[in-house]
């Protein structure tokens, strides 16, 4: 090829679509459980909290091994395995009702809804375990998405562009969450909640067919010109492993134990642990929050508008990955060196302040539900901007050969933090409603939500301080 190509952005678009499908699959339960699944299986907030927390812990544990698996299998095959498993898991949710009916000895959903006493308890228990199995399969596959995506970004983008590329594909989470309330409740309403899982789950198999024909490593891709390859590898000499084949067994790699001896690893791990649970809480609980506190269902026009607005605001995060590049370019124009880690930490500090607006969600919610939705949307946008940059710190400081492994370890920490958040939230909401507890002028379940919002608002600043303390300056790890 004699002209410069931009195929790296096609790959970025594929990562974007994979992440969008990932979050669509993840959102089906949160948008159907309160209105469709809860009455059929006699669930309460504790059941839902248990399911989301188990999903988080399975996701966390699998993230630890998913990164290592992707490093071993290679980006192309590793991504195919991941999305194939999670798509199968998504479709498997549709079988939970049939299995529950068979175990309990009932014949249809109407009989399950009308059940009372011990039968209702049995239905709730059996169905919960069925969903736990399906959810675990989903978590197993979804755990591979971000390790594979971050590894792909490191292969196709120079360091200065990685946060921006990450913010673009990470925005797929917002797009998936954005389209979810416009499609999933309607599918559930007209086709049944089971078909909502199946239809959304099939999207992953379509993505797999496209990925097979498009992806190859840039140095082997027929779609990447020499000029584009030179751009991709512009900082090659700064990466001690970038001249090595990422998928060959002779390259130097880090074991789990070796990774844990580096402060850079612990900074990433703690940053993920402190903040991932916030995003997952908003993702899993906002539809229920609107229904519980304001009586707004996701199938209502108002509910759709509110959820759409929340994730439309979250889309602003796409600019969050551009901020470090602006800092670096500005410093270079002035003749000063500005390392990528310093640029990312400066950007992350800015983003850490925005979630503080969530502290006002409950007080302003007394005026209109639009206020908490807008404020939560700002918090979600800040999280996604933070997430794009914290993921990119891995590529800045670790060799390419172990990026997926390190990302997986950090993802495990984020999943554990999320598991803790989901379980505590579910139990707190049941407790606050049962005891009519009060907190800063709010009573019952709204008081429980206010407590969780306070935790969400402050987690980022605490996480940033710990990260900066552990790794005050940029230092590349060499093997």
Protein language model regions, located:
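Helix-loop-helix hairpin linking two adjacent transmembrane segments in secondary transporters
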Residues: 173-222
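Multi-pass alpha-helical transporter architecture, strongest
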Residues: 207-215, 358-364, 449-479
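Cytoplasmic helix-loop-helix junction between adjacent transmembrane helices
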Residues: 130, 134-174
């Amino acid at each position: 090829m004699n002209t410069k190509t931009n195929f790296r952005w096609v790959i970025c678009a594929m990562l974007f679509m994979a992440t969008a499908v990932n979050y669509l699959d993840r959102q089906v339960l949160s948008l159907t459980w309160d209105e469709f699944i809860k009455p059929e299986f006699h669930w309460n907030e504790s059941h839902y909290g248990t399911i989301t927390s188990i999903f988080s812990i399975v996701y966390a544990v699998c993230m630890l091994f998913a990164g290592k698996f992707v490093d071993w299998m290679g980006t192309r095959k590793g991504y195919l395995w991941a999305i194939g498993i999670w798509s199968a898991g998504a479709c498997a949710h549709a079988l939970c009702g049939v299995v529950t009916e068979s175990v309990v000895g009932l014949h249809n959903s109407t009989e399950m809804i009308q059940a009372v006493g011990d039968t209702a308890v049995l239905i709730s228990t059996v169905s919960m375990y069925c969903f736990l199995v399906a959810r675990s399969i989903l978590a197993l596959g979804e755990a591979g998405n971000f390790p594979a995506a971050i590894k792909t970004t490191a292969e196709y983008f120079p360091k200065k562009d990685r946060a921006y590329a990450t913010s673009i594909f990470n925005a797929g989470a917002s797009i998936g969450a954005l389209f979810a309330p416009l499609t999933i409740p309607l599918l559930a309403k007209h086709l049944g909640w089971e078909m909502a899982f199946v239809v959304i789950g099939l999207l992953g198999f379509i993505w797999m067919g496209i990925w097979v024909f498009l992806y190859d490593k840039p140095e082997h891709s027929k779609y990447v010109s020499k000029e584009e390859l030179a751009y991709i590898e512009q900082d090659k000499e700064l990466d001690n492993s970038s001249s090595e084949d990422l998928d060959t067994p002779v390259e130097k790699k880090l074991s789990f134990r070796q990774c844990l001896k580096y402060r850079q690893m612990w900074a990433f791990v703690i940053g993920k642990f402190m903040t991932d649970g916030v995003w997952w809480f908003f993702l899993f609980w906002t539809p229920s929050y609107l229904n519980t506190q304001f009586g707004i269902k996701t199938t209502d026009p108002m509910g759709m508008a509110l959820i759409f607005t929340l994730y439309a605001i979250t889309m602003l995060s796409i600019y969050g990955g551009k901020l470090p590049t602006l800092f670096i370019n500005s410093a270079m124009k002035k003749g000063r060196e500005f390392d990528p880690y310093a640029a990312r930490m400066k950007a992350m500090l800015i983003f850490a302040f925005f979630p503080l607006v969530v502290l006002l969600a409950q007080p302003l919610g007394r005026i209109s539900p639009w206020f908490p939705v807008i404020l939560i949307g700002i918090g979600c946008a800040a999280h996604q901007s933070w997430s794009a940059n914290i993921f990119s710190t891995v590529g800045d400081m670790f060799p390419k050969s172990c990026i997926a492994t390190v990302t997986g370890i950090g993802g495990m920490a984020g999943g554990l933090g999320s598991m803790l958040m989901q379980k505590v939230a579910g139990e707190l909401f049941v407790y606050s409603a049962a005891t009519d507890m009060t907190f800063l002028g709010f009573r019952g379940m709204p008081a429980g939500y206010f407590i969780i919002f306070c935790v969400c608002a402050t987690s980022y600043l605490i996480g940033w301080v710990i990260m900066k303390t552990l790794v005050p300056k940029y230092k590349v790890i060499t093997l």
